[in-house]
Amino acid sequence: TRINSFLRFDSNLLNAFRSIGSIEGVDYVDLNYPEHFADYDIEVIKAKMEECGLRCNAINLRFRDKYIGGEFGNHEPAISQDAITLCREAADACRKLGGNQMIIWLGFDGFDYSFQIDYVSYWNRIVKAFRDVCDYSKVPVSIEYKPYEERVHAFIDSFGTAVSILHDVDRENLGVTLDFCHMLMKRENPAYSLALAARKNKLYGLSRR
């Protein structure tokens, strides 16, 4: 389960583990990086999860206001590199917690009006960044797409675009996480997208929130 829904009522991460662990049948959690790691050492997080009978399913990357001009595709090399470094740190955290995958949603990589960006250069920067992250990561890396928000138009906005990224990045440990609501926002056929991703063993996760 996602921890954020529990943190709305109690901002203490360790208390959230306790609440989730008390629910019968729930034994995996997703954590956001870096926000859920801000107040506790990773060993403390791991110990509390084990105490509550929980395991890490995935680490979800969360990029904040610093990346409002884009994460991987940002035209400023220093900011793009910072985004890559954040993913590397998240991969380390995922591995230490025994997580199954790292999920990357590039909410700020996109544009708000036509011709705002050089689309080809932007694409190439994103592909290069994913290669860097995948080559570093010891865990599977999954792309979660959304058609819009935080930008008017997300760069990786659809199943088709995500699959094209997978093709160009060309790494065995890169796949997709399909969010049911995001697919409906894009007016996609969720079952169709799921079947095509699974056909190539690239379906790394399915979210129904």
Explain the meaning of each model-derived region.
Residues 2-11, 74, 117, 152-160, ...:
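Gly/Pro-rich active-site loop or hairpin
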Residues 1-95, 171:
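N-terminal pre-domain/capping segments
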Residues 62-65, 107-109, 209:
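Short connector loops/turns at beta-strand edges and beta->alpha or beta->beta junctions
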